[in-house]
Amino acid sequence: MARGPLTYRRLRAILKTFGVYEEPGRGKGSERMFVGIVDGKIIRLPTKCHNEGDEKPVPVIQAIRRHFKLTKKDGVSDQEFYNRA
């Protein structure tokens, strides 16, 4: 799959394969909390999700990847990222 928008459900499944999980009961209202360990530290990132089928635009996906060090610079190519799950 080429680099492009993803549904929230698919994004969550891809992140799970990299050890980043959605923390249940966290976040306020339409926000959901992603949690992962980066360089030995627990990292949290809130993201908007009104429903599971919402598409996340490329800039949001890029920000999430940077936050959890899942970029090409960190050794994870676009192809490897998008072909997970």
What residue ranges belong to the model's regions?
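Basic nucleic-acid-binding interfaces
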Residues: 1-28, 33-85
